[in-house]
């Protein structure tokens, strides 16, 4: 199990994306001739509700380092059906991306569990998108697969971890 929005989680997610043949096919051409990289902006992480010492040491370090004022940022580098990189960052100005998808932590949990479709969630304003929505719509199947792939990552959510004694 890996803790959501940590280095371990993003690395596992990257591996799972690259192992998915259906994603590779549906995302062919994504990011070719344009920047297809994303920042996932996870807002309102309830850090005050996370039990003390609940995280494994590396996840606790990541949460302390990468969650700033209740917000975390994850970079997903996507090109032509592959995920070439995935990692958390402190400041979104550190990288140039073509797209930023923003939303509250509770909505990200639903998306990471494949309880909502990303396109429907964007259209329903559960998330905001900075970037060319027409390009995202053209690759709607790939976007939906990214959500279902995230659900296959064995994930622990920071606010659902029991306190360790």
Each predicted region: which residue ranges?
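Feature captures hydrophobic
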Residues: 1-165
């Amino acid at each position: 199990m890996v803790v959501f929005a940590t280095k371990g989680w993003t690395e596992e997610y990257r591996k799972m994306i690259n192992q998915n043949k259906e994603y590779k096919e549906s995302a062919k051409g994504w990011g070719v001739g344009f920047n297809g990289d994303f920042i996932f902006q996870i807002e309102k992480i309830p850090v005050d509700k996370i039990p003390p010492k609940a995280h494994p040491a590396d996840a606790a370090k990541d949460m302390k380092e990468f969650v700033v004022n209740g917000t975390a940022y994850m970079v997903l580098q996507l090109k032509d059906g592959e995920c070439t990189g995935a990692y958390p960052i402190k400041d979104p100005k550190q990288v140039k991306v073509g797209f930023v998808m923003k939303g509250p932590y509770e909505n990200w949990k639903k998306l990471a569990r494949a309880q909502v479709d990303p396109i429907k969630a964007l259209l329903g304003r559960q998330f905001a998108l900075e970037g060319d929505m027409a390009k995202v719509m053209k690759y709607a199947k790939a976007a939906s697969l990214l959500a279902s792939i995230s659900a296959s990552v064995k994930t622990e959510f920071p606010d659902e971890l029991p306190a360790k004694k």
